[in-house]
Regions:
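Conserved beta-strand scaffold positions in the cores of enzyme catalytic domains, especially
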Residues: 28-31, 112, 163-169
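Conserved phosphate-donor/acceptor-positioning beta-strand/loop module used by diverse small-molecule
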Residues: 90-91, 107-130
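Small-molecule kinase domains that catalyze NTP-dependent phosphoryl transfer to phosphate-bearing small molecules
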Residues: 127-199
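ATP-binding Walker
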Residues: 13
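Walker A/P-loop
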Residues: 16
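P-loop (Walker A) phosphate-binding loop of NTP-binding proteins
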Residues: 10
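ATP-dependent small-molecule kinase phosphotransfer cores
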Residues: 30-88, 92-100
Length: 200
C-alpha cells in the first residue's frame, strides 16, 4: 500500500525544496508535482489556448472534476510504475482536488500538511526561484489570487486542526524535513504548530 503525504500551501513556501532535500537523504520515496503534469497535458491537448481558458473550456465540456481526473490518472500511472512505496504530492490547491485523488486512487494511508510562511519570505523565495522582476505589492495580489483559488479553505482547516496539520516558516532556516519524516515513517505525529506572529 502506498503511503502519501500531500504538501499544500502557497507558491515559494519551500514545499518542493524541502521535499527534494528529504528525498536526497532517504530511499524509496517519490515526489510528484501536479504543476508540470498539468502544463504537459495542456501543451499536448491545446497549446494555442491559455491555461486558464483551456481549463474553463474543459470544465464546460466535461464538468468541474475534469482537471482532477486528468491529474489523478497521471499520478496513478506514475505510482503504479514506480517501486517507491512512499510519495510526496505537491501542487494541489483545493480540498476537492485532494479528496478526488484520494478516492480515485483508493489511497488509504495519507496525511496532509499545510506549509505557510511570512509574505516577505514567500516574496524573497519567489524572486530567487522565478527570476522575475515583480514588486512586493504585485506579489501580494498574486498571492491573494492563489489563496482565493482554494488555499484559504485548506489553511483555515489546518489552523483549526481539521484533518490537516500546519507548519509556519519564519525563515528558510525553518526546516521541516523532520516533520515530513514523521508522516512517512509512521512515527507518532506531534502536532507541532508554529503560529504566525502578529497575525502574519
Amino acid at each position: 500500500m502506498k503511503k502519501v503525504l500531500f504538501l499544500v500551501g502557497p507558491h515559494a513556501s519551500g514545499k518542493t525544496y524541502s521535499s527534494r532535500e528529504y528525498i536526497a537523504k532517504n530511499e524509496n520515496i517519490g515526489m510528484i508535482d501536479t504543476g508540470p503534469i498539468m502544463r504537459r497535458i495542456h501543451k499536448e491537448m491545446d497549446p494555442d489556448t491559455s491555461m486558464g481558458d483551456w481549463v474553463k473550456k474543459l470544465e464546460v465540456q466535461y464538468g468541474k472534476n475534469i482537471t482532477s481526473q486528468l491529474i489523478s490518472n497521471e499520478i496513478g500511472k506514475i505510482m503504479s510504475n514506480d517501486e517507491c512505496d512512499k510519495f510526496i504530492l505537491i501542487g494541489f490547491r483545493t480540498l476537492e482536488g485532494i479528496a478526488f485523488t484520494i478516492q480515485h486512487l483508493n489511497i488509504e494511508d495519507f496525511s496532509i500538511l499545510y506549509v505557510d510562511a511570512t509574505k516577505e519570505l514567500l516574496y524573497q523565495n519567489y524572486l530567487a526561484r522565478e527570476k522575475k522582476n515583480i514588486s512586493f505589492e504585485d506579489f501580494k495580489n498574486y498571492l491573494q489570487n492563489e489563496l482565493n483559488s482554494g488555499l484559504t479553505k485548506l489553511m483555515k482547516m489546518a489552523l483549526n486542526g481539521e484533518m490537516i496539520d500546519y507548519y509556519y516558516r519564519f525563515s528558510n532556516d525553518d526546516n521541516f524535513e523532520e516533520k515530513i519524516d514523521s508522516y512517512l515513517t509512521n512515527c507518532e505525529i506531534k502536532k507541532l504548530r508554529k503560529e504566525p506572529k502578529n497575525g502574519k
